[in-house]
Amino acid sequence: MKVLVLGAGVAGVSSAWYLAEAGHEVTVIDRAKGVAMETSFANAGQLSYGYTTPWAAPGIPTKALKWLFKSHPPLLFRPDGSLYQIEWLWRMLQNCTAAHYQTNKERMVRISEYSREMFRRFEAQTGMNFEERKKGTLQIFRQTKEVEAAEQDIAVLERYGVPYRRLKPEECAEFEPALARVTAKIAGGLHLPADATGDCHLFTENLYKLCQEKGVQFHFNQTISRIDHNGLRIKAVETETGRFEADAVVCALGCFSRTVLAQLDLDLPIYPVKGYSLTLPVTNSDGAPVSTVLDESYKVAITRFDNRIRVGGMAELSGYEIKLPEKRRETLALVVNDLFPEGGDLSQALFWSGLRPMTPDSTPLIGRTRFENLFLNTGHGTLGWTMSLGSAKLTADIVSGKDTEIRSDDLSLSRYQA
C-alpha cells in the first residue's frame, strides 16, 4: 500500500519507519528543509516514560492564577485574539477534575510504557546512537506541598508497575551528585530509574537515514495547499510544487495538524503550547547533571547529553508565534544556575523555542478519522519524544489493519466527538 506521511518530525519519521517495516511504500513530506526542524529540534531531551503527567490536573486553575504574579511563571497566558484559544482553555479546564486526571494519566502512561518497550526493541535491532543515557529521571520538589501533591502521581505509577523511589533531600545526591551543593533548596525528590534521556533531533536524523535505506522517499520544502478527496476518501495531497497520491495518509503535523485538516471540516482540538530551551556546553562534568533533573516548581527539566546540557520547559499559550523573549531565557538560566552553577557555560548557550501540539486532555490523537484512509499521529504535547516510537507503532498497525499490542480505541479523535 502507498502511504503518505505528512510531517517529518519525530512522530512522522517514526511512523514512516514502522510503516516501511510493515512492507508499505512510504513517502514523507514536510515544509522544512530537513527532518526534526521544528518541535523536535531542541526539546528537553527527556524520555520520561514514568513521568507522564497531564497538564490538566486538579488544582491547576488555582495554581495558574497564582503563577500570574510570579516573576518566573511556569505557565503564561497571552491572548492570541482567537475565540478558539478560549474554547480550548475551557475544554482543558473541564479535564482538571480528579476523575478526568486519572483517566488521562492512565492513557498517557499506557502509551509511554509501550513506547519504552518499542525503544528497547528498536535499540536491540539497530544499535543507534543518539546520546542516550539510561539513568532515570529525578524530580525535585522545593516545597513540602509539592512532595505531598506527588502522591497522586505515585498511585498511578504503582498501578502500572512503574518503579520509583521517594527521596529525602540529602538522598537526591545519590543519583545527581552535583545536587549535594544545594541540598538546602530541596524539600524532597522522586526518582524514576527506568527513564532515560536522548537527543531527539539526532535520533530523528539517524532514523531518517535508516528509513531511506528501507526505500522511504522524503520530499522537503513542501507546503500543503490542498487535500483532494472524493467523499470520505483522500485521493491526494497537493503542495505548492507537487501532487502526492496515496492509498492512505498519516497526519503527523504537530500543531499544524489542526490548520491543515480544517479544510476537511475536521476539528482537531490541538493548541500550540510554546516551550523554550537553552543548550549549553558542559564545562565541569562533576558539576553537571548525570541524567534529567525535573524542577517541579519551575516546570523546567535539566538534561545531560554527552557534552551538552539542555534546559527546557515552561508553557506559554500565545498562538503560533515563536519569538524569544529575554525573560524566558532568564528563567531557564536561573534554574540551571541555581541547581548546577558549575556545570555549564551560560555565555555560550543557544536559546530556542518550539510549539508543542497539546490536546485539552494531554493525550495524543492516534488512529482513524471519519475519512476511511486518513489517520492521525499527533497532539502529543510535551511528550512527543517520549511517546514517539510507541505512537508510531500503534499508527502503523492501525493503518495496516492489524490488532494493536495495547489498547488504542480510546486514543482516536472520536473521544472528542462523542
Swiss-Prot record:
Q: Which InterPro entries match?
A: DadA, FAD-dep_OxRdtase, FAD/NAD-bd_sf
Q: Pfam families under this entry?
A: DAO
- The residues listed in the UniProt record as binding FAD, with positions renumbered to this chain, are 3-17
The record's function comment reads: Oxidative deamination of D-amino acids.
Disulphide-bridged cysteine pairs: none
What this protein catalyses is: a D-alpha-amino acid + A + H2O = a 2-oxocarboxylate + AH2 + NH4(+)
EC numbers: 1.4.99.-
User: Family assignment?
Assistant: Belongs to the DadA oxidoreductase family.
Q: What is this protein called?
A: D-amino acid dehydrogenase
Which keywords are on file for this protein? FAD, Flavoprotein, Oxidoreductase
Q: Which SUPFAM superfamilies match?
A: FAD-linked reductases, C-terminal domain (SSF54373), FAD/NAD(P)-binding domain (SSF51905)
Q: Name one GO biological process term.
A: D-alanine catabolic process
Q: Which cofactor does it need?
A: FAD
